[in-house]
Amino acid sequence: MISAAQLLDELMGRDRNLAPDEKRSNVRWDHESVCKYYLCGFCPAELFTNTRSDLGPCEKIHDENLRKQYEKSSRFMKVGYERDFLRYLQSLLAEVERRIRRGHARLALSQNQQSSGAAGPTGKNEEKIQVLTDKIDVLLQQIEELGSEGKVEEAQGMMKLVEQLKEERELLRSTTSTIESFAAQEKQMEVCEVCGAFLIVGDAQSRVDDHLMGKQHMGYAKIKATVEELKEKLRKRTEEPDRDERLKKEKQEREEREKEREREREERERKRRREEEEREKERARDRERRKRSRSRSRHSSRTSDRRCSRSRDHKRSRSRERRRSRSRDRRRSRSHDRSERKHRSRSRDRRRSKSRDRKSYKHRSKSRDREQDRKSKEKEKRGSDDKKSSVKSGSREKQSEDTNTESKESDTKNEVNGTSEDIKSEGDTQSN
């Protein structure tokens, strides 16, 4: 009844008995009441119904729509149903493999027993037959000897014994042939490598076809094919994550290598920068040393220049002083000369003036004498003579004043000329 209900569920659905107004049950493919083996392909319980390998009915839901939903879902072959299905099928194959091995062992054991059982009795029978043959030959020789001697009764008794031995020998020979025929019949059995059933070698083709089309043989053949297919699928599925993992790992390794190269480049750049900074610092120190050396040399040169300039200035000042002293001496000599000249000119002028004065005095004294003479002589003409004498004395005084003025002007010109010569000599000294 359960298998019939499941068949009806597969054909008409689990809600076949519900009324139109009743709510239908929405079962997902991941529900525990759903057969996960059926979702993966087929349920093994459906393969061996009414066979020696019958697994019994499956009480879980077998729904084609649920299997389609599972195949379309994003969790297809990711939940682990396929691995469970593969393990279950491998357990069934392990069971049938054990059955096949037991069948092969049974055939081997029976063949060994048959071969050992046939070889043992046959060998013994052959030995017995050989012994009986030897006895028969010996008895026949004795019978011939007894017959030649005329012992007929003894010969007849021995002939009966020979007949009995021959019958026993024939019985042993017939037994050996029967055992060999039975052993030949047992060797024609074999074991099916798919389902483990015993087959007769050289059996009719119809019986062979019936076996190949049977549920048990087809079920195990399907299980073997499904196991190989699942192994291939799972291998590919495992290779894809492995490949993805490998690609991811390779990508990470490349990134690590790139990071390592970047770190190495940065380290080289930092090292180069440090070296450049060190070189720049060294250059700066060199420049500073050169600058200091230049400043020291410049300072020393300046000091030497100052010394030289001071010495030159001192020399120049000394030469200038000498020149100035010389110019002063010259000026002094010139001034002295001028003063001498002035003094001489003045003395000359004084002498001249004195001489003039003397002359004028003499002249005046003479004039006074004459005037006195005139006064004395010409007392009568005093008025007119006085006028004339006054006019003459005024003209003489004017001439003396003009003479004094000319002498003063000549002295002034001489002083101006001496001053200009002194200024010119000082200019020449400064230019030198």
UniProtKB/Swiss-Prot annotation:
Biased composition (Basic residues): 288-301, 312-367
Primary localization class, coarse: nucleus
Compositional bias annotation for Basic and acidic residues: 234-287, 302-311, 368-414, 421-432
Entry's localization field: Nucleus speckle
Record-annotated membrane-spanning stretches: none
PTM annotation (N-acetylmethionine): residues: 1
Record cross-link Glycyl lysine isopeptide (Lys-Gly) (interchain with G-Cter in SUMO2), residues: 424
Coiled-coil regions, chain positions: 124-181
Positions where N6-acetyllysine occurs in the chain: 231
Keywords, ordered alphabetically: Acetylation, Coiled coil, DNA-binding, Isopeptide bond, mRNA processing, mRNA splicing, Nucleus, Phosphoprotein, Ubl conjugation
GO biological process: mRNA splice site recognition; RNA splicing
Cellular component terms (Gene Ontology): nuclear speck; nucleoplasm; nucleus; U1 snRNP; U2-type prespliceosome
A single GO molecular function term of this UniProt record: RNA binding
Crosslink (Glycyl lysine isopeptide (Lys-Gly) (interchain with G-Cter in SUMO1)) position: 424
Region described as Disordered: spans on this chain: 234-432
PTM (free text): Phosphorylated in vitro by SRPK1, SRPK2 and CLK1.
Phosphoserine modified-residue sites: 3, 110, 115, 420, 425, 431
Subunit-structure text: May interact with SFRS1 and form homodimers. Interacts with JMJD6. Interacts with RBM25. Interacts with RSRC1 (via Arg/Ser-rich domain). Interacts with RRP1B.
Family according to the record: Belongs to the Luc7 family.
Role this protein plays: Binds cAMP regulatory element DNA sequence. May play a role in RNA splicing.
UniProt-recorded name of the protein: Luc7-like protein 3
Organism: Homo sapiens
Source organism phylogeny: Eukaryota, Metazoa, Chordata, Craniata, Vertebrata
